[in-house]
């Protein structure tokens, strides 16, 4: 098993071997490779390069190693996320150009959707800031932190306008969304409000609005530590089932946490009273990922220059730190199972 690590540095992308516990490859030809995505069918790793003139680098797995096989511009600035559709199209969320791009290869001119508007926050929401684009079944979803909304597209016709636009409360600053694998439910984590909104994906009615912060904590700024708490990533663990999210900049920068709660297996809603805070060994968990069986968890601790790898006990959120991986400003982690690479 491999663990791929993206960073907000000049590169490279790091490939860590989970068996030998060592960095086995450093993938060059990237700049600020903050997001990575694996496409299993083609055995290709797609890397979003979060620089002003953003681009995507593509690495192919062959004969036990990665090789750079493609690199194309996206006609957008600072892509923070990407997804690969079944037809080979690559979608990127371009944070600093208020746009979503669709590209296919270096010889194809990107198709770009531009967004306009603003919302409540005087610094973070003066314009559109798409933060994520992701695919689920026949849907493509883009999440816009600056406009306080997310949009749903038909994956078969991403050249058209969105089929659904969902507005969230002003000032919430939505960041990432994750869809339940078997239930018609999705979970939207909001960076600025430190809250998760639960939606019915048939109607996109909001079912719940849940805080990820400890009960005693507020969003008021501390003059000694001006960085306010900000939520980052969200995921579903299906053997609980649990909903898990990461909190950044708690406790005056001393120690951050994962928030977790049990989900109702029938409705997919958060079960009130099951919320827990799991303290981590560091600060700024910008991204995390469970492996396919959810027995392992990797957490990118951006401000500590470390990735933490935990063992998770079955059907619980009890975590045991196994080891740490030095990595400069890690921003994204991606497990690649042996069967993915075979």
Swiss-Prot record:
GO terms for cellular component: cytosol; nucleus. It comes from Schizosaccharomyces pombe (strain 972 / ATCC 24843) (Fission yeast). One of its GO terms (molecular function) is 6-phosphogluconolactonase activity. Belongs to the cycloisomerase 2 family. Residues 104-126 have a biased composition (Basic and acidic residues). This is Uncharacterized protein C18E5.01. Gene3D superfamilies: YVTN repeat-like/Quinoprotein amine dehydrogenase. Residues 102-129 are annotated as: Disordered. It holds the Pfam family Lactonase.
């Amino acid at each position: 098993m491999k663990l791929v690590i993206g960073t907000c540095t000049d590169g490279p992308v790091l490939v860590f071997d989970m068996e030998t516990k060592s960095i086995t490859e450093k993938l060059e030809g990237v700049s600020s490779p903050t997001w990575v995505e694996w496409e299993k069918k083609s055995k290709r790793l797609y890397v979003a390069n979060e620089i002003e003139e953003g681009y995507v680098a593509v690495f192919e797995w062959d004969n036990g190693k990665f090789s750079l096989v493609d690199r194309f511009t996206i006609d957008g600035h600072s892509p923070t996320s990407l997804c690969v559709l079944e037809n080979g199209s690559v979608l990127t969320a371009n944070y600093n150009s208020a746009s979503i791009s669709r590209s296919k290869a270096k010889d194809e001119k990107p198709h770009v959707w531009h967004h306009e508007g603003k919302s409540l926050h005087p610094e973070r929401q003066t314009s559109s800031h798409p933060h994520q684009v992701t695919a689920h079944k026949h849907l493509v979803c883009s999440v816009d932190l600056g406009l306080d909304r997310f949009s749903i597209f038909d994956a078969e016709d991403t050249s058209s306008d969105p089929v659904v636009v969902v507005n969230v409360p002003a000032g919430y600053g939505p960041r990432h969304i994750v869809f339940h694998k078997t239930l018609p439910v999705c979970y939207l984590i909001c960076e600025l409000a430190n809250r998760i909104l639960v939606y019915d994906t048939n109607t996109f009615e909001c079912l719940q609005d849940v805080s990820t912060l400890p009960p005693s904590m507020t969003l008021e700024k501390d003059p000694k530590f001006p960085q306010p708490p900000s939520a980052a990533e969200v995921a579903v663990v299906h053997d609980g089932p649990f909903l898990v999210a990461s909190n950044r900049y708690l406790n005056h920068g001393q120690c951050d946490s994962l928030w977790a709660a049990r989900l109702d297996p029938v409705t997919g809603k958060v079960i009130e009273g099951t919320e827990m805070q799991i303290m981590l060994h560091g600060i700024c968990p910008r991204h995390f990922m469970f492996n396919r069986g959810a027995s392992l968890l990797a957490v990118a601790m951006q401000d500590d220059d470390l990735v933490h790898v935990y063992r998770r006990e079955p059907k619980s959120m009890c975590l045991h730190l196994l080891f740490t991986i030095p990595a400069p400003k890690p921003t994204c982690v991606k497990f690649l199972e042996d069967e993915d690479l075979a």
